[in-house]
Amino acid sequence: GFKGAFKNVMFGIAKSAGKSALNALACKIDKSC
């Protein structure tokens, strides 16, 4: 239902936010950007 869809959206947002945060961190560490 609606709750499940909302949970999936929130999970997707959290996942992509975490990914970009990790990428930014890796970029700072090894200066690859």
Swiss-Prot record:
GO terms for biological process: defense response to bacterium. Disulfide bonds join C27-C33. One of its GO terms (cellular component) is extracellular region. Transmembrane segments: none annotated. Expressed by the skin glands. Pfam families: Antimicrobial_2. Keywords: Amphibian defense peptide, Antibiotic, Antimicrobial, Disulfide bond, Secreted. It is found in: Secreted. Its main location: secreted. Has antibacterial activity against the Gram-positive bacterium S.aureus ATCC 25923 (MIC=9 uM) and the Gram-negative bacterium E.coli ATCC 25726 (MIC=9 uM). Belongs to the frog skin active peptide (FSAP) family. Brevinin subfamily. This is Brevinin-2PTb. The lineage of its organism: Eukaryota, Metazoa, Chordata, Craniata, Vertebrata.
